[in-house]
Amino acid sequence: MNNTVLVNILRFIALLAAQALVFNKVSLFGIAFCFPYILFIILYPVNGNRHLLLLLAFLLGICQDSLLNTGGPHAVACVVLAFMRPTLFKFAFGISYEYQTIKINERIDPDRLMFILLSVIIHHLILYLLEEFRFSLIPAALLRTLCSGIFTLVVCVITIYLIKPGKQ
């Protein structure tokens, strides 16, 4: 079995377990929730199989939906994030994305931070708009997106530093 495949399997299981056991129970003031399980989609190898990523993103989201007993907004948000990932790479990294020289989990520079921030905001915006699903609640969804996005971004950056402490 390839080392990258093993790392991805362990990352999938570890992030989903951490989400289920710790982060699903954490909220700040009832507005900000943390969803670091999306790090799996963010840290998936640039040159990895895109169809497999879409399938794994759906599986990751549907597992989260099962844990929270929700109707599928996590699955939709994860699949949309996985689908938009190449566009986000092009926006954040420009031409270097084409040569697949990017490793998100090495160190956090402005390009990587921009990619992570955009990924988190897109995921959360889709998630909360699907959860609220009323025009009158759009401001509440935007507030939850902003607060949860900041919370998730901080946790994701800390997690990346904890995963690869020797490379910083």
Where are these regions (language model features)?
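Terminal, non-globular segments
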Residues: M1-Q168
